[in-house]
């Protein structure tokens, strides 16, 4: 299981399964694999399913 951190908003970032403290910083991205970082963005929200 990959560990995804909350990026931006919890509701928008489905990729982040483990919802930890979402920082207010917008630059806060999912700290995991390259896919996770991409999945964090709304454009890649659909790709989050795989991860």
From Swiss-Prot:
One Pfam entry name: Protamine_P1
Cleaved signal peptide residues: none
Keyword Nucleus in record: yes
GO BP terms, alphabetized: chromosome condensation; sperm DNA condensation
MF GO annotations: DNA binding
Protein localization: Nucleus; Chromosome
Tissue: Testis.
Keywords: Chromosome, Developmental protein, Differentiation, DNA condensation, DNA-binding, Nucleosome core, Nucleus, Spermatogenesis
One CC-aspect GO term: nucleosome
Family classification: Belongs to the protamine P1 family.
Role this protein plays: Protamines substitute for histones in the chromatin of sperm during the haploid phase of spermatogenesis. They compact sperm DNA into a highly condensed, stable and inactive complex.
Protein's recorded name: Sperm protamine P1
Record gene name: PRM1
């Amino acid at each position: 299981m990959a560990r995804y951190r909350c990026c931006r908003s919890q509701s928008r970032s489905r990729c982040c399964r483990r919802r930890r403290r979402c920082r207010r910083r917008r630059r806060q991205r999912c700290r995991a694999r390259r896919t996770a970082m991409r999945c964090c963005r709304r454009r890649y929200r659909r790709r989050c399913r795989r991860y």
